[in-house]
Amino acid sequence: MNQLLCPGLYCPFPSQTNKYVDVLEEYSLEWVLRFNLLANESAYKRFCKSKFFFLAASAYPDSKFEELKITHDWLSWVFIWDDQCDLSELKKQPEVLNNFHQRYLEILNGAELTSQDTLFSHALIDLRKRTLQRASIKWFNYFISYLEDYFYGCVQEATNRAKGIVPDLDTYIMIRRSSVGVYAVLALSEFCNQFIIPDVLRNHHLVKKLELITTDIIAWSNDIFSASREIASGDVHNLIFVLHYHKKISLEKAIEQVVKIHNEEVHSLIKVESSLSFFSEELDVEITKYISGMHSWIRGNLDWCYESYRYHNLERLELTEFK
C-alpha cells in the first residue's frame, strides 16, 4: 500500500539532544551483541536503522553517560522484545508469551538463571545488576510494575490476534496504554536524572492525569508513524485502523482524526500542568523535573520517529532462538 502521509503534529516542546549522542552511537551495538539479541543479519540491520541511541539521547537530554548507556540498553531490550511480540510467531501465542513474561518478572525480582533461560533473561540479569548499582530498590520496584503493565498489553494484543478480534475503541485505548510502555520510560527519566518523585506526588491525581495524557500523546504519534507498516502487515492494533474499521471511514480521514486527538491531548497536558499547585518549594522542584521528563519524551519520541527507519519497513521476523 502507499505510504500514509503524516500531517504535522503539534508539539511546543523544544528539541534537545544529549551531549553524549555520538559516543552513545558508537556504544549502541556493544551490549546487544554481547548478549546475542540480534538473531541474524536482518535483525542487525533493522536495529542499526532504528537508531535507538538517538531516541535515548533525545528523550533523556540531561542524563549522565553511564545512566544513558543503561537506559539505552533497556530501550534496546524492550524494542527487540517488542518485535518478537508483534512480528514473530509469538504474536498469536498469548499463553507462550505470558510464560516468557512471568519468567522475566521473576528475573527482575531477583531469581537466578537456570539452563532453560533465554538470551533475553540473561540480558535482564545484566540490566538489573547495572541499574540497581545506581538506583534504589524502591524505584526499581516501581519500574518493574510498569514493565509488568507493558507485558500485559503485549499479551492482550496477542490474544486479539489469535482470536481474529478487532478491539472496539475503548478496549483498544485501554490495551494501548499498556502496550506502549510509556510509564516505564518515564520512570527511566527519574533514573537518568538521579531523582525519585515522592509518593505524595506519584499518587497525586493530577500527576496521574499528566502521566495518562503523556501516554496517549506518545501512543497516538507512534500509531500515526507506524500505520502503514502495521496495516500492511494485517495488524489491527493501531488507532487509525480501529477508527477506520469501526467508524467505516477512509484511512486518510482516520489519520486526520488521530492527529486531531493527539493535538488536543497536547493542549490538555499544558492545561493540567497550569493547574498544579503544591505547598512546598521542594515538591515544586520535583514535579518540575518530572514534567520536564514528560516533555522530553514527547518531543524526543517525535524527533526519533522522523529520524528512524523503524516504521518504514514491512518485514516478518523469525522467532529468536531462545538458547
Swiss-Prot record:
Keywords: Lyase, Magnesium, Metal-binding. Mg(2+) 3 binds at N222, S226, E230. Gene3D superfamilies: Farnesyl Diphosphate Synthase. Binds 3 Mg(2+) ions per subunit. A motif (DDXXD motif) lies at residues 82-86. The keyword Magnesium applies. The keyword Secreted does not apply. The Asp-Asp-Xaa-Xaa-Asp/Glu (DDXXD/E) motif is important for the catalytic activity, presumably through binding to Mg(2+). Catalyzes the cyclization of farnesyl diphosphate (FPP) to the sesquiterpene germacrene A. PANTHER family: BETA-PINACENE SYNTHASE-RELATED (PTHR35201:SF4), TERPENE SYNTHASE (PTHR35201). This is Germacrene A synthase. It comes from Nostoc punctiforme (strain ATCC 29133 / PCC 73102).
